[in-house]
Swiss-Prot record:
One of its GO terms (molecular function) is 4-alpha-hydroxytetrahydrobiopterin dehydratase activity. The keyword Acetylation does not apply. Keywords: Lyase. This is Putative pterin-4-alpha-carbinolamine dehydratase. It holds the Pfam family Pterin_4a. It is an enzyme of class 4 (lyase). The keyword Lyase applies.
Amino acid sequence: MSTLNQAHCEACRADAPQVSEAELPELLKQIPDWNIEVRDGVMQLEKVFLFKNFKFALAFTNAVGEIAEAEGHHPGLLTEWGKVTVTWWSHSIKGLHRNDFIMAARTDGVASGAEGRK
């Protein structure tokens, strides 16, 4: 199990450091199925989760919402029929913070127990 999955988010201020190029490979090893996307110059973690139908996709979306609320760190969520795209990044620093990797790992934990996965 990923050590990130057991960690908690810390408060992220506008002057908090982004994940460094040196830290990036080690953190990505713990969430190997996530991709880095760059949108408008902002690095983001993204992963698509597939489900058997909309009901299961919506339940997963709500479960991710619950962990996001508990940690005070919120993703971009796109829920479609049979598919949820989850995107993590830290708005305040316009990039990736350790919190994003923690929440990606925790999202994987939610997905591992989610009903209706494809």
